[in-house]
Amino acid sequence: MAISKSEVEYIAKLARLKFTEEEIEAMAQELSKILDYVNKLNELDTENVEPTAHIVPIHNVFREDEVKPSMPREKVLMNAPFTEQGCFKVPKIIE
């Protein structure tokens, strides 16, 4: 599956990454190779394979929440493109 340069640019914009023209071309090739590999997995016959979440028995170990010191709000919000009333402001995606 070929990834176009415009798709790489769109993904980079979403991730707030900036690439040179050469990096965009390299990323398009690399992402195309990755998607080709993932598509190969669709060829596997998994009809008789029992669905699992983990290949080994595993369970979550929960702990009590503890309030710990963190970064000041102002410092955290310095990297946010949009803020409002001391919070992150994100585009509305649900009507």
UniProtKB/Swiss-Prot annotation:
Its EC number is 6.3.5.-. InterPro entries: Asp/Glu-ADT_sf_sub_c (IPR036113), GatC (IPR003837). It comes from the Bacteria. It catalyses: L-glutamyl-tRNA(Gln) + L-glutamine + ATP + H2O = L-glutaminyl-tRNA(Gln) + L-glutamate + ADP + phosphate + H(+); L-aspartyl-tRNA(Asn) + L-glutamine + ATP + H2O = L-asparaginyl-tRNA(Asn) + L-glutamate + ADP + phosphate + 2 H(+). One of its GO terms (biological process) is glutaminyl-tRNAGln biosynthesis via transamidation. Pfam families: GatC. Keywords: ATP-binding, Ligase, Nucleotide-binding, Protein biosynthesis. The keyword Nucleotide-binding applies. One of its GO terms (molecular function) is glutaminyl-tRNA synthase (glutamine-hydrolyzing) activity. Gene3D superfamilies: Glu-tRNAGln amidotransferase C subunit, N-terminal domain. Heterotrimer of A, B and C subunits. Belongs to the GatC family. This is Aspartyl/glutamyl-tRNA(Asn/Gln) amidotransferase subunit C. It comes from Caldanaerobacter subterraneus subsp. tengcongensis (strain DSM 15242 / JCM 11007 / NBRC 100824 / MB4) (Thermoanaerobacter tengcongensis).
